[in-house]
């Protein structure tokens, strides 16, 4: 399979907020934020909580893992993860008549499918042919036998 390229993505840093009830020995793989890695007194921690609330974080979010919504073409956790998106033929075809007159003065807007280029700084897309055109080895063997 010489046509496949290995895609390399930057790992997104995961930041976990540690509650005061948990010890750091229980979860050694977690990345601590700079404010947590510094030794601080309880009074300073209260000031930090007030600052984080002012920045838009909810106070109850301090003890929970940050959750990001899934969009359908998510990257895996490992560096060897590949993203493959099959193109929809209907979206690739251009209209035969051309754009409508009122659309000439407006920016063309195309619906997003979740597999567009440019989703990240180093994203590369691997395009595959239409699955209907690709024959599997099982199909070839079945046709050669009478």
UniProtKB/Swiss-Prot annotation:
It comes from the Eukaryota. Residues 19-32 have a biased composition (Acidic residues). The keyword DNA-binding does not apply. Residues 16-146 are annotated as: Disordered. Keywords: Phosphoprotein. The modification Phosphoserine is found at residues 63, 105, 144. Residues 79-92, 107-120 have a biased composition (Basic and acidic residues). Isolated from prostate cancer cell lines; expression associated with progression to androgen insensitive phenotype. Expressed in normal testis and at lower level in normal placenta. Belongs to the GAGE family. This gene belongs to a multigene family expressed in a large variety of tumors whereas in normal tissues, expression is restricted to germ cells. These genes organized in clustered repeats, have a high degree of predicted sequence identity, but differ by scattered single nucleotide substitution. Their sequences contain either the antigenic peptide YYWPRPRRY or YRPRPRRY which is recognized by cytotoxic T-cells. This is P antigen family member 1. It comes from Homo sapiens. The gene is PAGE1.
